[in-house]
Amino acid sequence: MLIIPAIDLKDGACVRLRQGRMEDSTVFSDDPVAMAAKWVEGGCRRLHLVDLNGAFEGQPVNGDVVTAIARRYPNLPIQIGGGIRSLETIEHYVKAGVSYVIIGTKAVKEPEFVAEACRAFPGKVIVGLDAKDGFVATDGWAEVSSVQVIDLAKRFEADGVSAIVYTDIAKDGMMQGCNIPFTAALAAATRIPVIASGGIHNLGDIQALLNAKAPGIIGAITGRAIYEGTLDVAEAQALCDREQR
């Protein structure tokens, strides 16, 4: 299991939101490229970038920052989400050196777009499913749909999706532990690898994820915990490596 540091981009800065609310953000750095360097030097093997402005506007806003990070670390797998709603945007990021693009809102509203993207960019597409009480949320979490997460995840199995990033909105940015039972259930219900996201606070939460013994969980995204110092990236990754030998 990989520990994946999150860099959330808002107005060119690195921030964290509480429960997806743009008005409730904390700025952690005005230099996201330097922040990426910090996590790389700390031993991370993958980075999770989110264009928050892009998620709300439906098109890339902080793309220049994403490109700068991808070009600085050409051998580091980078995944980007937020505002990815066209094949042109995916092509732009892939050409810039980004390893994976995360399709969120568009995947819920137009599931056929995921299949189209997977055909055009095989191995490059991740689906981001954000949920509240098991139901998918869209548009920067502003809307909660009547679609169940597990049902939608199964629909993407035949498309060739590389992974699903599952975020429990109620947990995100609250550092109260992630929704392990549902994350494990999702991993068991689909053949697509799952990346857990939202609510990780400390090493105990990583241990709890490992204790779930769900082989389909391949990563855990962490944000506020590593910025506020309650979780150390290198220590958490070492724990995962030891447990999964």
From Swiss-Prot:
- On the tree of life, the source organism's domain of life is Bacteria
Provide any one GO MF term from the record: 1-(5-phosphoribosyl)-5-[(5-phosphoribosylamino)methylideneamino]imidazole-4-carboxamide isomerase activity
Could you tell me where this protein is found in the cell? Cytoplasm
Name of the featured protein: 1-(5-phosphoribosyl)-5-[(5-phosphoribosylamino)methylideneamino] imidazole-4-carboxamide isomerase
The organism of origin for this protein: Pseudomonas syringae pv. syringae (strain B728a)
Q: What pathway, per the record?
A: Amino-acid biosynthesis; L-histidine biosynthesis; L-histidine from 5-phospho-alpha-D-ribose 1-diphosphate: step 4/9
Which terms in the GO cellular component ontology are assigned? cytoplasm
| Record-linked InterPro entries | Aldolase_TIM, His_biosynth, HisA_bact_arch, Isoase_HisA-like, Isoase_HisA-like_bact, RibuloseP-bd_barrel
Keywords for this entry? Amino-acid biosynthesis, Cytoplasm, Histidine biosynthesis, Isomerase
